[in-house]
C-alpha cells in the first residue's frame, strides 16, 4: 500500500515475497528466508501446532500467517489485528494464547520480552524476504540489488543473524 500510494520509496523490513505483492511492486534480491514462528507465555508454552486447536491465536492481517492458519489449521481461532503493535499488545494483555508471524520477528520480540518463549521456531513453508520498490523504479531496484550483493560478499546477513537471533 505505501509503495503503491507513493508514501515511501522502499519497503525493506521483513517484507515477504508473495505472488500477490509481486503484481503490485518490484522485489529486489532476497536477503533472508523465514518460516512462521509461534510465541506464547512461558507459563503456557505452545510447542506443537496441534496445541492451538480450539485456542486463540493472534495474527496481523495481511501477513502470511493468515492464509496459512486458515487453510491448514481451521480449528485455531484467529484473532486478527491491523497493526503489529496491537497484535503484540494483545499477547502482552493475555487476549490470546499465542501470536504467530515470521519466525525472525517472534524470536527478536521474545528476546526483549521476558516471560515469553518461541515454542515453535519454524512452521509452514520457507518464504523469502526482500526489499521492494514501486513497479518500474529500475534505478532504485538496481542500486538495492547491488548493495545486497555487496553485503552478501561481507557475510553481513549471516553475521547479523548469528549475533542477534541465533542465541534465542
Which ranges hold each PLM region?
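Periplasmic-binding protein-like
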Residues: 32-40, 103, 107-149, 167-168
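A ligand-binding cleft/hinge motif common to bilobed small-molecule-binding domains
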Residues: 13-23, 68-71, 92-125
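Ligand-binding clefts/hinges and TM-proximal coupling segments of bilobed small-molecule sensing domains
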Residues: 64-81, 117-122, 148-168
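Conserved functional loop/turn residues at catalytic and ligand-binding sites
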Residues: 6-7, 56, 80, 95, ...
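Acidic, polar ligand-binding/catalytic clefts
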Residues: 1-51, 117-124
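Hydrophobic residues within well-ordered alpha-helices
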Residues: 3-4, 52, 91-92, 131, ...
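Bilobed "Venus flytrap"/periplasmic-binding protein-like clamshell domains
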Residues: 15-16, 33-89, 103-107, 138
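Stable alpha-helical elements in mature extracytoplasmic
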Residues: 7, 11, 48, 65, ...
Amino acid at each position: 500500500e505505501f509503495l503503491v500510494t507513493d508514501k515511501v520509496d522502499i519497503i525493506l523490513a521483513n517484507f515477504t515475497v508473495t505472488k500477490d505483492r509481486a503484481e503490485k511492486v518490484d522485489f529486489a534480491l532476497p536477503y533472508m528466508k523465514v518460516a512462521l514462528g509461534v510465541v506464547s507465555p512461558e507459563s503456557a508454552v505452545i510447542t506443537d501446532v496441534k496445541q492451538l486447536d480450539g485456542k486463540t491465536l493472534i495474527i496481523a492481517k495481511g501477513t502470511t500467517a493468515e492464509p496459512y492458519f486458515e487453510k491448514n489449521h481451521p480449528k485455531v481461532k484467529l484473532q486478527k489485528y491491523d497493526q503489529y503493535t496491537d497484535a503484540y499488545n494483545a499477547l502482552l494483555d493475555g487476549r490470546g494464547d499465542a501470536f504467530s508471524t515470521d519466525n525472525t520477528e517472534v524470536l527478536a520480540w521474545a528476546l526483549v520480552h521476558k516471560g515469553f518463549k518461541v515454542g515453535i521456531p519454524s512452521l509452514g513453508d520457507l518464504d523469502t524476504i526482500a526489499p521492494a520498490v514501486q513497479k518500474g523504479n529500475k534505478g532504485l531496484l538496481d542500486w538495492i540489488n547491488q548493495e545486497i550483493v555487496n553485503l552478501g560478499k561481507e557475510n553481513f546477513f549471516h553475521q547479523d543473524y548469528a549475533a542477534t537471533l541465533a542465541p534465542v
